[in-house]
């Protein structure tokens, strides 16, 4: 356990739509985060992205103390992985086969790599799967932490997933299924425990979708200026970095 200085906070930041605007991390955002770090606060990225696609550009601009990736399924403090969770092969195979049946673009995620099925390479990850049944034949070493379906699923399909999985996060245009009970809020709890502080010392900043859990859970939830209505309703504060 590491100590956090008295009266300092752990700031958890979504990436896409929060610190990353689609082209990069704005200079004013990077400067604001640098000031927060200089004042003794801890900065954590808390993202739905797998660790392998949290780019060097983003890491260099934010200079985080840690990274929570793939909706809380992996937590790094510096270079140390303090928590990781993976699906059973049965659950991963079920999800990939389900995506194949639905005829949708599927992304299979681990800390080290992404694998695409029924779609193109994603963010430079050139790993592909032609048939769901070949997942663990082609990638026997893969520890799957999250599976994403890259289009909207019908309510009937979502109901099938929710019968088997605790967290099924349906957004506009994609659906995420992380392992177990992992989400951005459970990650905040684990990081706060690591530093020996309560969640009242956590600030969570987000804009949409899978940020809702952490914005509601943290001691202080902050909605970005571009946030969706549900995030703004759940937040304690509105802000624009």
Feature map (PLM): residue ranges:
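Asp-based phosphoryl-transfer active-site loop
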Residues: 7-23, 215
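Active-site metal-binding loops of divalent metal-dependent hydrolases
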Residues: 17, 49, 206-208
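Short, acidic loop-to-helix structural element flanking the phosphoryl-transfer center
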Residues: 21-41, 87-91, 128-129, 181-193, ...
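Active-site phosphate-binding/coordination module
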Residues: 27-122
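Hydrophobic/aromatic beta-strand patches that form the interior of the parallel beta-sheet core
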Residues: 44, 68, 203-205, 222, ...
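Structural recognition of alpha->loop->beta junctions
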Residues: 60-78, 129-134, 139-143, 232-237
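Conserved acidic, metal-coordinating active-site core of Asp-based
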Residues: 98, 102-214, 226
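Asp-based, Mg2+/Mn2+-dependent phosphohydrolase catalytic module
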Residues: 217, 221-241
């Amino acid at each position: 356990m590491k100590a956090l200085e008295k009266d300092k906070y752990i700031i958890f930041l979504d990436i896409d739509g929060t610190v990353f605007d689609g082209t990069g991390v704005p200079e004013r955002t990077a400067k604001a985060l640098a000031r927060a770090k200089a004042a003794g606060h801890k900065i954590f990225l808390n993202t739905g992205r797998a660790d392998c696609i949290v780019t060097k550009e983003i890491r260099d601009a934010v200079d985080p103390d840690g990274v929570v990736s793939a909706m809380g399924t992996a937590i790094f403090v510096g270079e140390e992985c303090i928590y990781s969770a993976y699906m059973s092969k049965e659950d991963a195979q079920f999800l990939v086969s389900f995506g194949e049946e639905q005829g949708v673009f599927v992304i299979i995620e681990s800390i080290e790599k992404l694998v695409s099925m029924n779609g193109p390479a994603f963010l430079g990850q050139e790993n592909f799967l032609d048939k769901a049944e070949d997942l663990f034949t082609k990638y026997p070493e893969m520890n799957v932490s999250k599976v994403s379906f890259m289009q909207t699923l019908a309510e009937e399909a979502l109901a099938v997933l929710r019968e088997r999985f605790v967290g099924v996060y349906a957004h506009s245009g994609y659906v995420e299924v992380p392992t177990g009970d992992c989400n951005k809020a459970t990650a905040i709890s684990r990081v706060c425990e690591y530093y020996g502080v309560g969640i009242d010392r956590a600030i969570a900043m987000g804009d949409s979708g899978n940020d809702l859990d952490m914005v509601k859970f943290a001691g202080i939830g902050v909605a970005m200026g571009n946030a969706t209505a549900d995030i703004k309703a759940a937040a304690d504060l509105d802000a624009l970095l």
